C-alpha cells in the first residue's frame, strides 16, 4: 500500500502532535504551524475543521491512508459497542503498531519497515503485512537472523519500561513479546478525539 511521502515534521507542526522522534524535537523549538503566518494564525475554527483535524491525527499517527481508514471505520460501525472505541482498538491491533508498542522501533514508521522487510514473526510464522491484526495470545518475535540488528538494540535500550503498555509483555533479552489483550480505550494514551471522527463520518 502507498505511504505518505511528504514532510512528517511539517504535518506534525500543522496538527500540533509529534509523529516521529525528529518531529518531537522540532515541536519543542517551534510549537506552531509551518509557514510564514504559522505563529499568527488565530480565529474561530469550524466544527468541520476540528473533526477533520482529529481524523488527520489518527491517520498520520497510525500511518493509515484514507481508503483503509474508512474501511476500519465501517468495520467499527458494524461491531458491537462504541464505534470510536472499536476504531481505536483495531488501529492498536495493527502489526506495525504492536511492534512499535513493544519498543522494537522508536517510531511506527520504523516498525512498519521491520514488518515489510520480513524481520518479524507472529506465532513462529513470518508476517510482512503492517495491517495484519494481532490477537490476544499472539507471540511476536524477530527472525533468528534479525535479532541482533543494531537499530533494534538501540531502540530497546532507549525504550523506557513505562512506554511499554500493560497489554503487551516484552522479553527484551530474547527480542520477543506477547500481545496479552486488546486494550480498552481509556488505556490508549494518544492525543486525538475519535468521537469527532465518528461525527465527521456520520454526516
UniProtKB/Swiss-Prot annotation:
This is Small ribosomal subunit protein uS4. One of its GO terms (molecular function) is rRNA binding. Part of the 30S ribosomal subunit. Contacts protein S5. The interaction surface between S4 and S5 is involved in control of translational fidelity. InterPro entries: Ribosomal_uS4, Ribosomal_uS4_bac-type, Ribosomal_uS4_N, S4_RNA-bd, S4_RNA-bd_sf. It comes from Chlorobaculum parvum (strain DSM 263 / NCIMB 8327). Keywords: Ribonucleoprotein, Ribosomal protein, RNA-binding, rRNA-binding. Residues 93-154 form the S4 RNA-binding domain. One of its GO terms (cellular component) is small ribosomal subunit. The keyword Ribosomal protein applies. The keyword Lipoprotein does not apply. SUPFAM superfamilies: Alpha-L RNA-binding motif. Belongs to the universal ribosomal protein uS4 family. It comes from the Bacteria. One of its GO terms (biological process) is ribosomal small subunit biogenesis. One of the primary rRNA binding proteins, it binds directly to 16S rRNA where it nucleates assembly of the body of the 30S subunit. PANTHER family: 30S 40S RIBOSOMAL PROTEIN (PTHR11831), SMALL RIBOSOMAL SUBUNIT PROTEIN US4M (PTHR11831:SF4).
